[in-house]
Amino acid sequence: MQQNAYSAEFSRAGGMLNATTKSGTNDLHGVLFDFLRNDKLDARSFFSPRREILKRNQFGATVGGPVIRNRFFFMASYEGMRERQGLVFNNIVPTAAMKRGDFSGPGLPIIYDPLTTRPNPSGTGTIRTPFPNNIIPESRLSAQARFFNQFIADPNTSSGTAAFAPSRSLDQDQLTVRGDWNLTNNHKFFARWSWHDNRQQDPNAYPAVGRAPLKTHAHNLGASFTSTLRPNLIHEVRYNVLTGIITLEGFMQGRDLNTEAGIKGFTETRRPGTDGSFPDFLWSGYSAMRSSSFDQRPKTQDRLVHEFSDNLTWIRGRHIAKFGGKVRYYRPYFTDSKQYVGDWSFTGINTENPASPTGTGNSFADWALGLPATVLRAFPGNTFGGSGTYWQFFGHDDFNPTFAVEPRISPKRKIFRC
């Protein structure tokens, strides 16, 4: 990692990460490796009653050698990882009785009927009448709320919360292949191809909502041709191309839950590739049930980069001069669909006593009646991108008058066009 004093050929960064891939040799060599981590080998966290689930295995191999001795070599490497990591969710949830509209349990606030809202005869503002026995009649319960209640876990702890300990899975595979060809003693060519595949499954805080996949696929191809024109004059041409796409799916993506629940207004405005996923529900005082707002899912990130560079290095006396330029074409394309299938917020404002709100109203009572405080929907989903071409020309001279001092002259010119 270079954080300062790097060459003029590098720019537009606070630091440079230099990475190299090994080339093959005249001898055939190979390596196998495996790195294992497991909760059975770990100590318990100080604040946890038990050890968290962890199963992580990194493994791979490299092999390299000659294709034609002294002329053509190859090197290949593979690395894989399989990980299962435990997570802990402890949700504040309503009781099964509350999901049926029964708020008569101990410690619950008084629930007022919003249909009885009327002017306060003895003052300003409005008043309401409580539901008899603090129970909402079944005929008043929202069909949409009753549909989504199936995804809300019941309390399973002595404190009245719903504890859930799923594991998050992560599978990765990486492959790199490189070839080196010595055309002559003064002309050398190499090419490298790298492939990366990432597959992750993220669990929701509510187990019935399931898991959402995160997928990453990337390819990188690089090639270089180096010529030693004279013992002190070296010419290098490089080309690189990078393609990559990241896909984050929503929870239950592909299932039209709004239509199943009877929520209208979404079927006519679907967006290809993101049809159906779980909406977002937020209740004051309870754990939210988030889906699309989790990492702004569903979304995609698509990138394409081409880069060509041409450099000439000249060594004369105590001078090491380098001149050249590069051109880079960059085309990003992003989509995200946060709140695309709806974001409903319930605060208890519809079931409180407007004349004296303290100790009255409940956000889940508002939910049971189908009366949100706010409803949001982002439409159409965000789509943004474009393309640009970046040009850079530079000159760089390292001059060493003594062993202790190294002046550096680095003029350069950059052009960026969108």
Functional labels for PLM-detected ranges:
Residues 1-418:
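Short acidic-glycine motifs
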